[in-house]
Each structure stands twice: as C-alpha cells, then as structure tokens.
Amino acid sequence: MALLQISEPGLSAAPHQRRLAVGIDLGTTNSLVATVRSGQAETLADAEGRHLLPSVVHYQQQGHSVGYDARTNAAKDPANTISSVKRMMGRSLVDIQQRYPHLPYQLQASENGLPMIATDAGLLNPIRVSADILKALAARATATLEGDLDGVVITVPAYFDDAQRQGTKDAARLAGLHVLRLLNEPTAAAIAYGLDSGQEGVIAVYDLGGGTFDISILRLSRGVFEVLATGGDSALGGDDFDHLLADYIREQAGIADRRDVRVQRELLDAAIDAKIALSDAQAVTVNVAGWQGEITRDQFNELIAALVKRTLLACRRALKDADVEASEVLEVVMVGGSTRVPLVRERVGEFFGRTPLTSIDPDKVVAIGAAIQADILVGNKPDSEMLLLDVIPLSLGLETMGGLVEKVIPRNTTIPVARAQEFTTFKDGQTAMSIHVMQGERELVQDCRSLARFALRGIPALPAGGAHIRVTFQVDADGLLNVTAMEKSTGVESSIQVKPSYGLTDSEIATMIQDSMSYAEQDVKARMLAEQKVEAARVLESLEGALTADAALLSAAERQVIDEATAHLRIVAAENDADAIEQAIKNVDKETQDFAARRMDKSVRVALKGQSVDEV
C-alpha cells in the first residue's frame, strides 16, 4: 500500500526543511509576534529590544507609522491616530458611536453602513488599520528570522463572532499573510502553560487584556486541550480602567471641557502611567494640564472594584456551564497586561482559592502559545500528539413552524464540528423551504439572534411530511459557520456561509446566556404552547383536505360530530392554554378514527383494483 504524505495546503512538501511560522497576538492595546527557535517559543523584539508593539497607527498624506512612533503622535494629532481598532472589528457604525461616544477621530458610514475612519490618508476601515498592524509585526518577523513566512496563527478573543473573525482573516490577507488558523486567546495561553508544565486536570484561564475579558475553563488530559466552557465580556478590559482613572483625574483637576481632544489624550496617558506605577507603589504623583496631585492605590482600587467584580461573575457562570466547582480548578492562568493590577490578582486568588499562575509574562503568554501552535500546523512538529478543541459560545439552530428554535449545535460544543438534522414539509405540494439560521439559548425566534436566511427550492411536490430535507451545520476551526440544506430524494441543495455584517453588542452574549437561565421555565411553557398550536394547525389543514376529498364516506350525523370537534379546536387554538389545545386535538383524533379507517380502505381498494390475487 502506498503511503501518502498529507501537508497543509499551500505549503512546500520538501522534507526536513524547517518552515518559518509565527504566532501573532493581535491585541486591543498591544500586539506581539512570536516563533519557535531551537525548541523554545519566544516573542520577537524590534531593533530597540521592545517586544510589545502598541496597536496604534498614525496616518498622514505621505504615509503612516505603526506602534511607538504612532503613539507619540496621539496627543498632538489625535484625529489621525487610531488606537483600540480591535474594538471596532465587525461592528456597525451606530454600535461604535453608542458604545464609544468620545473617540478622538471622526467616523462615517460606508455605503453598506459599516464604519469608516476619516484621516488625512483618506477613509479607512478597521480591517485596513488592523492589516497595517499585522504588516508591521510580519516585517519584524521576516527581518529577525531572515526569511519569508510560511504561515501565521492569529489569536482572537473567545467571544469574537463570525463577523469579527472574518474581519481578522481579511486583515491578514490584506497584509499578505497565509493564515493557518485563528486561535482563541485563552486556548493559546493553555497551550503555552500546558506544554511547559505538563499539568493535567481542570485549569481556568483568566484573560484581562486592554479591550476584552475572557474566562475559559479547560481540561488538560494526556495532551488533549478541551475547553469545557467559555465566558466573558467583549468590551471590558484595561482600557476601561484607564478611562475611569482619567475621569477621576479630570474631576480632581477641575477640567470641565471634554471637547479638547489634546487634553483628553493627556489625561488618558497620565492615567495609564499612574495605573502602571500603582502596581508597585502605594501612591503616585500625577501632573496633567497644569495640575499636580496624588493618586493612591486604594483610590484606584475603589474606582475599578465594580469592573473586577463583573469579571468574577463571568467566572462563576463559566464554572456553572462547565459543571465544575472552583475548588476543582488546579491552576489559574493569568493572561493580559491588566492582570498585573494587584487588586485583580488578589480578587482572582480569593475567588478560586489559590494563587494565580504568572510565571510566563502575561503580556507574552498568548503569543507564545500561538507560536507553538503555528509551529505544529506548519509541519515542524509532525509527531505532536496535541489535540486542540475550541468551543462555540452560543447555540446554533433553525427556526421551525410556530416561531420555535430547534438547536442543532448546542453552546460549548467543541469545534471543528458538523451536525445534521432532518426536517420535513408542512403543507401538501410544498416546493420550497425557507431556512432561517438562529443563534442563542432561548426557545423562541423572537428571543434569539438572526444570523442568516436562505431558501431551498426544487423540493418535489409531495403530501405534507413527504419530503425530507437534511440540514447540516458545519463550524470550522476558525469558528465560521456553513449551513447546507439538501432534499434527500433529488439531491437538490442550497448553502450559505454565515458572515454577519457586524457583531454582537458588548453585553449581548452575556445577556442572552443569563436570560436563558432566568426565563427557562417561562420559555419551556411558551415552547409547549407554540408546539401545540403548530400541531393544531397541521391537524386542521390535513382534516380539511380529507373532508373535501372524501366527504361522501361520512353520514350527516358523523360529519356534524367532526365539524363540532374541529370548531372547538379552532377556538382553543386561538387561545393560550396548551393543555386545552392538546385535549382538543385528542378529541378530533378520536372523532375521526373511523373516517381515517374508511379512507385507508378506499385507498387500498383503488390501489388493488384490476389486480389478481397472485399479483397481490
């Protein structure tokens, strides 16, 4: 038997030739690039020895700068200095303006309503800005490694939805990079710590970066990384600490004018410096806009206490989803520069009952994990036994009759995954079916999020329930969803890749999960009522057709009894008593049993007419 060597598409198959691959942590505040050299994963520094690259781009008519050079222009040219662009990825203009009303640069809508940033270099979208950051990181890598990159792994928050993930991939392609995989940031951290320490058991990854918070509960066992549950907030991070402290300094300094963007930037820079200093000192002196004052760690802790508490509430929900007690967690991995804040480490340690792990630089750990994964995917570790299993954050399903949601892939299912279910037609002669893809945890369509719609046409005209449509949901390793519907007898099919024009609002995911628990009993009752109403409609429609076709099989008295039963069913079906509807359906079934038997006898006689006993 011939042996086939299977390699990553687009990569050279030359044996024993080490390929150049990097992991990129594309962060809200800072970004990093890392690689594996001599068996060790390490982040790559610039010519000045700096590993972090500020996720900031400054645009001018004659060109742009990225990183530290760009950040120095933030105070003197804020309108052309773009930072925290990751928060805009996959979002609508309206959403951005509502969530971040004090941005120092001008935004306007493109033709399709997506955000464009007005700069001296022209109108730019968030994908272009992200691409410029990725180009800078790639240039650092190629200069350091002295060769072209064969592939990259880019990390994204676990809560990024399809639009945000797709936007990240588009930015990478615009930067000329071959994306091996998008990797959830907490999972990347687990790879870094899992390989270094060889831990087995349940681990919590607490990731508090500049713009997002993620909590992941993972089980590490014999090289398998399985995410048991995820949670968090896609718009909570160290940036929020900075803004709270900046507002506090503004109040203390008596600065009332919020329209002066230069002063706003100075306040923010002062807040960032103070936050960093307070990680080591109990107090720090602040000088801004002609004001000098002292900020203590206790004052800072009081400002951010509510935000830290929000992260712990998300931790509690994630543990519940994973069916794990805090006492079962062996280690807590701290990720993100904001986890250097003493109050964060203190509260997290109290919550889990153990000292968090910080042996790997929390700024670098995600990039290091991504580099390890990139090294494997590019083919440099063909004997690796590590298996990576991510999860989807919210259930995926379809709308069915009655406005119900039929879940096809439950939340926290590991990916990549493919699941299929069969559905059937509701009406006689139905030749098309509308497929409505939903996301969420509730039972009714009105309480879930619409992802996409498409139609399957060319279904054979058969009696209701005669056609069988197989709907397949496939989620790839990057969390992108492809839905295919196929009529089984003819093979006719239609499909769609879900790429929403913009993502979820900041609190929508957490709210959807919380609501599913709060309204669980109410939702079950609503679903039962909707199901009974759908069944009543099916029975009435089917019976109406039967009475039209075979009324002659009934006496006048029999017809009157059936008419009374159906009339009663119509009345109760218009009300909201599921039990009453169920009883009315049973009554109709009882009163029509003889009629159904006669119709069956008639059908058999027609089918056997003209045939001999031997033929039968």
UniProtKB/Swiss-Prot annotation:
- CDD domains per UniProt: ASKHA_NBD_HSP70_HscA
Its Gene Ontology biological processes? iron-sulfur cluster assembly
Question: Which InterPro entries does this entry report, sorted A to Z?
Answer: ATPase_NBD (IPR043129), Heat_shock_70_CS (IPR018181), HscA_NBD (IPR042039), HSP70_C_sf (IPR029048), HSP70_peptide-bd_sf (IPR029047), Hsp_70_fam (IPR013126), ISC_FeS_clus_asmbl_HscA (IPR010236)
GO MF entries: ATP binding; ATP hydrolysis activity; ATP-dependent protein folding chaperone; unfolded protein binding
What the protein does comes down to:
Chaperone involved in the maturation of iron-sulfur cluster-containing proteins. Has a low intrinsic ATPase activity which is markedly stimulated by HscB. Involved in the maturation of IscU.
Q: Which NCBIfam families match?
A: HscA, PRK05183.1
As for family, the record states: Belongs to the heat shock protein 70 family.
| Protein name as it appears in the record | Chaperone protein HscA
Q: Which organism is it from?
A: Enterobacter sp. (strain 638)
Encoded by which gene? Answer: hscA
